[in-house]
């Protein structure tokens, strides 16, 4: 038998997850459906956060390459792109897991899949048996 919710938010990006958490805090039985497979939307998963992480690491690399000019000798500075990408992935994972933690803490039910309206009272989750 399908679960019943007071409200279901389709989309777990910055607008969706904040909305779902707040609705649950206000006492509504809340679900959130996200198709990406991890919460946070484009910004957190493939946009703003990963880009800023890589920009920050690149800036540090550039600074380190110029340390000698100000009297700091460190030897050869090399870029390890694999480690930079792992660091970026770690930053994204920490933040997406943080949103999942907030869902658990605030009792928001999280469904992975693509949500769409079946009718005015039912939502189908593609890739799931849940309605």
Residues covered by each model-derived region:
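The conserved SAM/SAH-binding core of class I Rossmann-like methyltransferase domains
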Residues: 10, 33-34
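N-terminal Rossmann-fold NAD(P) dinucleotide-binding loop
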Residues: 16-17
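Glycine-rich flavin
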Residues: 2-5, 21-28, 34-131
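Beta1/beta-strand and adjacent pyrophosphate-binding region of the FAD-binding site
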Residues: 1-13
